[in-house]
């Protein structure tokens, strides 16, 4: 069994939980996912099955799209709605929407983030959330991410001393939308957190086409495996090249191939089928992953 699944992960489960349940449903252990989603987040979780597990790193490289809500007025330990309140800055007067949009625009392009303490990033061999649960705070490594698009998608609404609005973000892998929400609040002079989030697109797959675990289980019971999409979907933004019969034979035997390209990696096709991921070595390409 090989292929890629567009899974709709529902709230209340980790990405690992989803993989564990799919292994039982599909009766195979060779399953991985293409990008972690926090337990409270609903949305597209790309799943790789069989040979497709070798495509996970390329699936993760593609940009992701999120829709969510930011609340100004208080921040939390986890930077989302599930954490305990750590700071409050009441919103006592209406915000200037133009200034809000300017602050949002200032957070587009390449930016630096510090991962939240409640995250799976490892420091000295331990995950940050393990330190956080033990009441310890450690120095967290900065990371460079890219925000391709960040826009407000609703008017600002007010409730008591809080302000809320929805947003849409297209970003690179490794981006923490929780942290982006907190950073925006800081630019506006308010404690803030991400109060809701949905991932609407990842690895070229859209939420409107995604299936829940329950829907997949129903199809498997009917021996309908049409939800398994081809490996070719997982190449992400890699440039496609058509290989000759002779080059395919070289790939089969692990030999270098002469190709003219400035790309560091290429997706080698034979007809409509992906046969290899090629890696540049000086003026030639070496088969890095082979699917023959």
Curated annotation (Swiss-Prot):
SUPFAM superfamilies: Pseudouridine synthase
InterPro entries documented for this protein: PsdUridine_synth_cat_dom_sf, PsdUridine_synth_N, tRNA_psdUridine_synth_TruB, TruB_C
Gene3D superfamilies recorded: Pseudouridine synthase
GO annotation, biological process: mRNA pseudouridine synthesis; tRNA pseudouridine synthesis
Keywords in alphabetical order: Isomerase, tRNA processing
Active-site residues (renumbered): 38
MF (Gene Ontology): RNA binding; tRNA pseudouridine(55) synthase activity
Residues that span the membrane, as ranges: none
Pfam families, per database record: TruB_C_2, TruB_N
Enzyme class: isomerase
EC number: 5.4.99.25
Catalyzed reactions per annotation: uridine(55) in tRNA = pseudouridine(55) in tRNA
Family assignment from sequence similarity: Belongs to the pseudouridine synthase TruB family. Type 1 subfamily.
Functional summary from the UniProt entry: Responsible for synthesis of pseudouridine from uracil-55 in the psi GC loop of transfer RNAs.
Name of the protein in its database record: tRNA pseudouridine synthase B
Taxonomic lineage from the root: Bacteria, Bacillati, Bacillota, Bacilli, Lactobacillales
This protein's encoding gene: truB
